[in-house]
């Protein structure tokens, strides 16, 4: 039997709030999470394939990797689109067939060039068929599943293909799908509204596998909504409580859940006993009318106008740190919404509040409504930090983007005063007394040391005064939460760095746009004083542009390339009209 080589490639993610790149530097990690989709796909290959996985967030793709491969398989989300294009170009140049799957190709496959085979949606049924067709020379360009697969047959992910130490957290998946149908969300379009779950035996085998491979610490259950099927979630939790206890609580768990979790006492208590210490909740906005308009009705209660705030405090009282997702730019948003977001985030004590501008994803109800209303501008980059909107908002765009930057620079201010104030309020709200004893301080010794070293650097920065005050308060009143505060501080450092770059990128693009608009008039005005005056103006402008460009972190420069090229082309055209040459390239 001739062995075939399959190269599984996970393209790069753009640096964002969720990448935690600047926190990972402290931890000695290369990426926050492994590519669970590709690790699961790897288990579907027959034995006559030799596999190699390249996570480009951990190491670069090399020419040797491509020479080794007989088949290249990729999996991407929309935010990885640009990196995927580079991967496909290199693979085709090397003469290798390319397979593309994941949420991005599922929605946008018609826009992706040079890919030989697309596997859309969930591939448990279609991937084995594709491999058989490939072997027989009858492989099709497009494979679309006829129905949602039961995931009770999904095999164990191939964690042995990665170095676990490269990552700050491991991933597992218990369910797919969500019973809700928010207008802006594509989850139900991709995975359906009837959550499908794995068996207890499957899940405990996955926990056991990671345990046997030596993993200890953070483990994220990446379900779209962990409590989408409450009965099955409770069934798993009861088994997981026993497993964690028998293994001395090796994992501290995190997941995503809808806000109505607070209405199910038994579920919350079981999650705490199973070792869940944090939960991500899609809050979106504190405005009930906007929530109803976008079909996020699970966040609204007619008899409680402050239901989201009360829900977050209830979760914290159970021992969960709540991470919140927020959206600006929803229909119905007014200029008052920015202060409402800031006020809510501070009152709710959500240190990690992931604020983003509304993104219209293809295939969502929002997409089709915007299409009917003639408000679509094109495809999204998938990065909710991008201030380039792919739709026409109701609010004036200048007001929206300026308000967005103000929100970010308030909740993640220069000295992180507001951030650390939220951390302190969280410590006051957080009740870990119900958690199993080992989970009351869930960090492990190596993490503690790294976070402590990171703290020393932060204490010497502009964030030092507010951080020092927080440390004094916590040591005095909540010493059991000290290591958790170290972790939050390191994450706050990352969130502030991202905020600085988002602000710098947007300000720089706006500066270039203004300069392009003013170029002709300014050069014409200076022409009255001769070419020497024009050259002085051009020299000063280019020097300023070069300085601002270099001040932007290299991971964010791709956001300004179009604006930079437009400016340089406009400048070159204006100078050429006067028979003057461009200044030295930057």
Show which residues each predicted segment covers.
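Radical SAM enzyme core and accessory elements
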Residues: 2-8, 50, 65, 386-586
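Acidic, low-complexity intrinsically disordered segments
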Residues: 2-215, 407
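Conserved beta-strand positions
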Residues: 8, 74, 221-223, 281, ...
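Flexible glycine/acidic-rich beta-alpha junction loops that bind and position SAM and/or redox cofactors
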Residues: 13-20, 107-110, 230-231, 289-295, ...
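A structural motif corresponding to the C-terminal end of an alpha-helix
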Residues: 41-52, 213-214, 274, 310-322, ...
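Structural recognition of alpha->loop->beta junctions
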Residues: 110-129, 270-278, 342-355
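Acidic/polar loop patches that form or flank catalytic/metal-binding clefts of enzymes
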Residues: 140-143, 219, 252, 323, ...
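Radical SAM [4Fe-4S] cluster-binding motif and immediate context
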Residues: 155-323, 330, 334-343, 371, ...
